[in-house]
């Protein structure tokens, strides 16, 4: 028999304006045949009107800021080229110095946002005019493959995930942002700092506001992937400090800090290797599930944020 949670879920499905028979059948299938427990994330839910407005306001604000920064600093591309030459980066076309993630425009009200994933900054593939999307290079393919292999998580990496960065400013390698800041002088250095602080504050606001409109079992998690530069004296120290501060402005926001998780980056399989090592040490014959991911994400969060 269905327990109370299941009955409520079925009622919500049947009364939803977006009810589709196939969604209901998928939900029933996983309820009956699931190995251990119902994965409530498997069912697709639309964003509420309020969530859709919150998301649209965010992407419009980000688009405006990217446009503003691009207009204010037309010489940024030259500095990026110079930093790449100094680092002996193989030649590539420099097309978009500050990247707005066009994948945000592909998210519709009919999509459920299950994750906000935060990378470092747009790399060579991301800044190409034909892309202008985050995590489309090798790291993105690894991330997409991870979720495809672990279908029990119920997450489509290209449909259920808002992908953002700690700064939208491009560099071939993240470390080259230091060279760009040094070569560009005080104004460019302040631009990079401003972009990190803005992204941290506005991303936290997005996360908190989305979850205020969401039931406990469907809370959106925020994953910080790649944390070496979040450590003391790291390149993203301003981002780290501003992000945490944004979650501790009041008691309601503070609750969502528990849904902020930190992981190794997807690049070079560091995420999957770290997860595998953790599972080998802490559980035998267990599957990758949300519980395991939260455990590991909290461990790394404590390493970086000290809580």
Give, region by region, the residue ranges found by the protein language model.
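Short amphipathic alpha-helices and their capping/turn segments at secondary-structure boundaries
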Residues: 96-109, 142-155, 210
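Active-site and ligand/interface coordination hotspots across diverse enzymes
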Residues: 14, 25-32, 39-138, 299-307
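Serine residues within intrinsically disordered or low-complexity segments
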Residues: 16-18
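Extreme N-terminal basic, low-complexity initiation segments
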Residues: 2-4
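Short loop/turn segments at strand-loop or loop-helix junctions that form parts
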Residues: 115-123, 163-174, 225-228, 263-267
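Glycine/proline-rich loop-helix segments at beta-alpha junctions forming the active-site rim
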Residues: 49, 176-307
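Short, surface-exposed acidic-centric catalytic microdomains
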Residues: 146-181
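Polybasic, lysine-rich low-complexity intrinsically disordered segments
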Residues: 9-12, 36
């Amino acid at each position: 028999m269905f327990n109370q949670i299941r009955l409520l879920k079925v009622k919500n499905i049947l009364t939803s304006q977006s009810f589709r028979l196939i969604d209901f059948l998928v939900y029933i299938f996983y309820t009956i045949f699931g190995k251990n427990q119902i994965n409530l994330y498997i069912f697709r839910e639309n964003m509420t009107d309020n969530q859709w407005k919150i998301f649209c306001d965010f992407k419009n604000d980000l688009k405006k800021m990217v446009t503003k920064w691009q207009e204010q600093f037309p010489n940024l591309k030259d500095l990026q080229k110079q930093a790449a030459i100094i680092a002996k980066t193989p030649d590539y076309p420099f097309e978009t110095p500050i990247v707005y993630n066009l994948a945000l425009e592909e998210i519709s009200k009919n999509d459920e946002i299950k994750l906000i994933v935060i990378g470092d900054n747009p790399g060579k593939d991301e800044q190409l005019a034909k892309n202008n999307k985050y995590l489309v290079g090798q790291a993105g393919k690894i991330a997409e493959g991870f979720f495809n292999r672990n279908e029990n998580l119920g997450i489509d990496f290209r449909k259920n995930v808002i992908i953002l960065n700690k700064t939208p400013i491009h560099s071939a390698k993240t470390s080259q942002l230091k060279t760009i800041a040094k070569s560009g002088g005080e104004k460019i250095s302040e631009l990079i700092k401003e972009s990190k602080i803005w992204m941290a504050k506005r991303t936290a606001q997005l996360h908190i506001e989305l979850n205020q409109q969401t039931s406990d079992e469907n809370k959106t998690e925020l994953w910080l992937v790649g944390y070496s530069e979040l450590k003391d004296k790291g390149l993203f120290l301003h981002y780290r400090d501003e992000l945490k501060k944004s979650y501790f402005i009041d008691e309601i926001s503070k609750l969502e800090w528990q849904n902020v998780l930190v992981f190794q980056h997807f690049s070079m399989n560091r995420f999957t290797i770290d997860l595998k090592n953790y599972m080998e040490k802490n559980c035998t014959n267990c599957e990758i599930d949300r519980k395991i991911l939260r455990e590991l994400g909290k461990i790394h969060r404590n390493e970086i944020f000290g809580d």
